Amino acid sequence: MAAKDVKFGNDARVKMLRGVNVLADAVKVTLGPKGRNVVLDKSFGAPTITKDGVSVAREIELEDKFENMGAQMVKEVASKANDAAGDGTTTATVLAQSIITEGLKAVAAGMNPMDLKRGIDKAVAAAVEELKALSVPCSDSKAIAQVGTISANSDETVGKLIAEAMDKVGKEGVITVEDGTGLQDELDVVEGMQFDRGYLSPYFINKPETGAVELDSPFILLADKKISNIRELLPVLEAVAKAGKPLLIIAEDVEGEALATLVVNTMRGIVKVAAVKAPGFGDRRKAMLQDIATLTAGTVISEEIGMELEKATLEDLGQAKRVVINKDTTTIIDGVGEEVAIQGRVTQIRQQIEEATSDYDREKLQERVAKLAGGVAVIKVGAATEVEMKEKKARVEDALHATRAAVEEGVVAGGGVALIRVASKITELKGQNEDQNVGIKVALRAMEAPLRQIVLNCGEEPSVVANTVKSGDGNYGYNAATEEYGNMIDMGILDPTKVTRSALQYAASVAGLMITTECMVTDLPKADAPDLGGAGGMGG
């Protein structure tokens, strides 16, 4: 086992604080509407330019191992805030730096670290309750656009696009961010349920100009099996032909004789048919077939429940207003399923999301909810160069996370004002002893740090602005973009409650651990092995 380097007490804390400051100082220059960019070198390709706190934090590794431990612990704050709310990473870092700096000063002055931590935790718990009380629900499109705009660093077009996407696919809908092809940002919305399976034969195409199959008011046959024998399909085909409507077959697979017969029928115009494979694999395929059945008021023909394809009737078939199939995707628009049944199915899937243990499962279940509840929107980010594209895409993703958080837990006044109001409401809070009271004061002072940093990044005097904001009440604050005072909510400067809450909780959690650190252990650097000496008589 390698020998260790051990540092105690003040020696350890000073080193740790130095690492915290290096990382936090690099991250906090990005805070606020007038925050600056940070350029990150890459081992290959062009450097990345970003204003995203967590991206900056992830890049920082320090040479001194003790300093690096301090930096890595603050990096954890940014990562946790990012995972929980998708935004607020810079705010969390600024809060953590302030709590650690003030807390370590108090420890150096002889306070008990454990009592300090208890005081900080008490203040943060009270602050979180006050934040919830200040929170206003965020439901209308205008508020969503404002949250998106603030989170995308005052880029109004991004805020509007996100609000429009949420309008179209609902709060539950899936919104994804992709690279665009032009200079402008675009929004593509797929209404209805879309899954990534295309037609099984190009002979089904009835719209050659678009290379797609379009079926109006079709019957939809859902089968959880491979279909290779046409005899199984004949009764359904005859019934559908009599009804004079097209038919879409969604099955595990349609092959051989069955597929050939369907193609011949379509080409001769006897009955309009198209066949696609069911989406997903294994149990997920069964679940998705059931989703489609709920959406179209059909029944999945499955041998597991004793149903045979030959005995299927028109009552077992689902229906939709329209189906569009191309090479890679199938979209079912306006299924005739009952709203109550669809909501029931959505509730059932939500329950599974609660119980899901892996992120992958959770994501797939969320997609299924979206497909049942609304649709899918794709924001295509436009930019002139690849470097700008990466930077902008990161901002749009941040803004999207922020708006989701706002819809979930509501919004509070932005620009660091909410934390100042919360701090003013809990100034009377008392701990069990004097050291805990100092811990409470440390947390209250930290709650001013985000506002001070936003003002500092504008080139103004933080103390003057902080005192002016403190002298007001409610949503009165400082608009750093226009350098005016006023009602933050009226000016459209909103922060999602979840983002502010997560930033405060994670910052206090990690800062509390660092304040109570008394010893740090790391590997001693290995001495380089001496070079092999030249062999005798071989000198130059």
Curated annotation (Swiss-Prot):
ATP binds at residues 30-33, 51, 87-91, 415, 479-481, 495. SUPFAM superfamilies: GroEL apical domain-like, GroEL equatorial domain-like, GroEL-intermediate domain like. GO terms for molecular function: ATP binding; ATP-dependent protein folding chaperone; isomerase activity. It is found in: Cytoplasm. It comes from the Bacteria. The keyword Chaperone applies. InterPro entries: Chaperonin_Cpn60_CS (IPR018370), Cpn60/GroEL (IPR001844), Cpn60/GroEL/TCP-1 (IPR002423), GroEL-like_apical_dom_sf (IPR027409), GROEL-like_equatorial_sf (IPR027413), TCP-1-like_intermed_sf (IPR027410). It catalyses: ATP + H2O + a folded polypeptide = ADP + phosphate + an unfolded polypeptide. Its EC number is 5.6.1.7. The keyword Lipoprotein does not apply. It is an enzyme of class 5 (isomerase). GO terms for biological process: protein refolding. Together with its co-chaperonin GroES, plays an essential role in assisting protein folding. The GroEL-GroES system forms a nano-cage that allows encapsulation of the non-native substrate proteins and provides a physical environment optimized to promote and accelerate protein folding. This is Chaperonin GroEL. The lineage of its organism: Bacteria, Pseudomonadati, Pseudomonadota, Gammaproteobacteria, Enterobacterales. The gene is groEL.
